[in-house]
Amino acid sequence: TLVGNLCNGSPAADSVPGMIAAGATVSVVSSSGTAEIRVEDIPVGPGLTNLGTGEIITAVNLPKRNKHEGDAYLRFIPRTEMDIAVVGCAVNLSLANGVISSAKVVLGAVGPKVEVATPAAECLLGEKLDENILSIFSDKCSELAKPISDKRGSEEFRKEVIGVIAKRAAKKAYDSALGNK
């Protein structure tokens, strides 16, 4: 579930990068009241969150999309029966006259927690997406990745694949923002 993926603190959780890229918040209820917390502030490490004892997420809140906004989440998995991402990337873009005016990029399964990749997003700002920009973006995502090696993939493999997946996600988000499906 959306909330289950968030609350287990896994860096490979599929829904978390997309929620963060979209600017989602959650409503958290505790004995001291209700608070609205950004999804990106919940995960703090593998299997760890900043939720306290007795705090319960009661709602996921997604902001309204703008007309020229698009997003995408892509992941790589080794086979369908092992449904845990080796790498994942979510991209949210807003356009003004085809030029990227805002960007948020979130990498999953390539570090101890889901990571907001601000330097990768910054290389997209003020640009129309083309192969040159996509190449720079892909390289930046690979550079920012800090994966481990495990049975699902080596560190080197994950660094390479996150660049490919990020490039595809950026293209898909850009096309969506342009109104293309």
Cite the ranges covered by each PLM segment:
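C-terminal structural segment of proteins
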Residues: 1-181
